[in-house]
């Protein structure tokens, strides 16, 4: 496995931008270095689609903009996109045989905005099929391997994104988070990742899984890098019905606030300029009970102790419905998935069976051949809970529970704490294939991330140590904020990363 030499030489996004501005390196050189590194690290299976001609054309355009003084804030920065975002030029498959060879006629808003800012895409990254999974083992194109230990999963569903960033193949990557799919792979691969408040980043052009839960978010080595990306990615999009418009910043009755795209930067500046003395960190007792591995607990506790040294105080809080987030999520998300994936029928686009009798057989065979086991499992669950006679008993009850989970968070933020911290995943990365006999065991790995997703809150993962038998599998600290508190979360993560070096560590080369 080979890291991009130029990328690691210059460091994060700000350092890369400075090097590009000073002509110490060109965008073409960075892009070619990244392409070479991606090829050398092909054993990780992080990339699904690479087109050097497209990448180098973007790099040449970035160099021209830099020379003309018209460059955007990310001009020449090498990134890559999760294969859940449609892209013009690169194929988009969502990790599924159903979309094998699909060519989108347009870019997703996230892709479009990053391109307008000058970022150079190295290609499309592997992911769990239709973003359904916690280990990136559900991709139709094979599992992604964790750069820290290639026997291990990278987390999912944005496993290719986390692996590419951890291996320093790219400066940053996009991901999607429905129930933890940015935070969990970020934690297991030792990088930083953030799920913004639901509605702050456009979902237009993001292949839908659970529409009331899906949210795009970036992954990068540091929180400062995340801020650079989030500043470009956020903002109202009239093409997305769930996109939030800017307003005066007053909270409504649910505690939500609608703000413009500059809110993260403003919150970051405000929080970053204040001492941490007196900051109340809520520590949910439910996050530190049975099921949490001792090595993960120790790393997270050490991170909390570091925040205490910076002046913050720990405050015990309770999120009593934490475990109930699992059944609530696995009713709501499959229900929405069964509706969203109904469009893949072999008629309009997607895989079509080669042999069939009538139209009904064509549709059923196309879906049976095109979808993998995990996707079929969730479609069946979703169809069942939405069926006549079960809708009230399951789906409506899950939605009521969702509201109660959100209220638990709001009570904690209103009366007890400023932010909430705890683990991202109950264990370090498992080995590939460990849960092959019980695929639903992966669902339990999301116990600390699902509640945040159901509530629509922002949360992030930052690397905070290592665990596992050989001590080389990363652990992530989850930082959860109130609605539209992305700036504060990023500022707190930055304060932590100023006094620790976990985010600067990269995996050593190893055979994949």
Swiss-Prot record:
GO biological process, one term: translation
Keyword terms, alphabetized: ATP-binding, Ligase, Nucleotide-binding, Protein biosynthesis
UniProt EC number: 6.3.5.7
GO molecular function: ATP binding; glutaminyl-tRNA synthase (glutamine-hydrolyzing) activity
Catalytic activity: L-glutamyl-tRNA(Gln) + L-glutamine + ATP + H2O = L-glutaminyl-tRNA(Gln) + L-glutamate + ADP + phosphate + H(+)
Leading EC class: ligase
SUPFAM superfamilies: Amidase signature (AS) enzymes
Pfam name, any one: Amidase
Active site as annotated: 82, 157, 181
A GO cellular-component term linked to this record: glutamyl-tRNA(Gln) amidotransferase complex
NCBIfam families: gatA
Family from the record: Belongs to the amidase family. GatA subfamily.
Job of this protein: Allows the formation of correctly charged Gln-tRNA(Gln) through the transamidation of misacylated Glu-tRNA(Gln) in organisms which lack glutaminyl-tRNA synthetase. The reaction takes place in the presence of glutamine and ATP through an activated gamma-phospho-Glu-tRNA(Gln).
Entry-linked PANTHER family: GLUTAMYL-TRNA(GLN) AMIDOTRANSFERASE SUBUNIT A (PTHR11895:SF151), TRANSAMIDASE (PTHR11895)
Quaternary structure (record): Heterotrimer of A, B and C subunits.
Name the record gives this protein: Glutamyl-tRNA(Gln) amidotransferase subunit A
């Amino acid at each position: 496995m080979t890291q991009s030499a130029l990328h690691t030489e210059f460091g994060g996004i700000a350092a890369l931008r400075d090097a590009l501005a000073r002509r110490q390196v060109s965008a073409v050189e960075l892009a070619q270095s990244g392409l070479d590194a991606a090829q050398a690290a092909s054993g990780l299976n992080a990339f699904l689609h690479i087109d050097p001609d497209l990448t180098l054309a973007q790099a040449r355009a970035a160099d021209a903009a830099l020379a003309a003084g018209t460059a955007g804030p990310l001009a020449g920065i090498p990134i890559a996109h999760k294969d859940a975002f449609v892209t013009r030029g690169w194929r988009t498959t969502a990790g599924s045989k159903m979309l094998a060879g699909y060519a989108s006629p347009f870019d997703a808003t996230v892709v479009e905005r990053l391109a307008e800012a000058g970022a150079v895409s190295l290609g499309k990254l592997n992911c769990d099929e239709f973003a359904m999974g916690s280990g990136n083992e559900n991709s139709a194109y094979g599992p992604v391997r964790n750069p820290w230990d290639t026997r291990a999963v990278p987390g999912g569903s944005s496993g290719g994104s986390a692996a590419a960033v951890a291996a320093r193949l790219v400066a940053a990557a996009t991901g999607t988070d429905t129930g933890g799919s940015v935070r969990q792979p970020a934690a297991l691969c030792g990088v930083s990742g953030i799920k913004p408040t639901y509605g702050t980043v456009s979902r237009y052009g993001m292949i839908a899984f659970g529409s009331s839960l899906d949210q795009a978010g970036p992954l990068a080595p540091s929180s400062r890098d995340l801020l650079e990306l989030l500043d470009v990615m956020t903002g109202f999009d009239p093409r997305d019905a769930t996109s939030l418009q800017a307003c005066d910043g007053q909270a409504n009755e649910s505690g939500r606030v609608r703000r413009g795209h500059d809110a993260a930067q403003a919150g970051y500046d405000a929080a970053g300029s204040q001492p941490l003395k007196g900051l109340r960190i809520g520590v949910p007792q439910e996050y530190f009970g049975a099921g949490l591995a001792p090595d993960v607990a120790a790393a997270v506790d050490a991170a909390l102790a570091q925040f205490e040294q910076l002046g913050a105080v720990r405050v015990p809080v309770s999120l009593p419905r934490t475990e109930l987030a699992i059944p609530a999520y696995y009713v709501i998300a499959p229900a929405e998935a069964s509706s969203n994936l109904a469009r893949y029928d072999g008629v309009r686009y997607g895989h079509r069976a080669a042999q069939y009798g009538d139209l009904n057989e064509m549709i059923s065979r196309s879906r049976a051949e095109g979808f993998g086991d995990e996707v079929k499992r969730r479609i069946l669950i979703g169809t069942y809970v939405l069926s006549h006679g079960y809708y009230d008993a399951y789906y409506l009850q899950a939605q009521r529970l969702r509201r109660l989970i959100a209220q638990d968070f709001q009570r904690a933020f209103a009366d007890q704490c400023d932010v909430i911290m705890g683990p991202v995943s109950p264990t370090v990365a498992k080995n590939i294939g460990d849960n092959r006999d019980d695929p639903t065991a992966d669902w339990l790995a999301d116990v600390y991330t699902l509640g945040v997703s159901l509530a629509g809150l922002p949360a992030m993962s930052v690397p905070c140590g290592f665990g596992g038998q050989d001590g080389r599998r990363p652990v992530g600290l989850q930082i959860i904020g109130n609605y539209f508190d992305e700036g504060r979360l990023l500022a707190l993560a930055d304060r932590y990363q100023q006094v620790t070096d976990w985010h600067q560590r990269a995996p050593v080369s190893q055979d994949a």
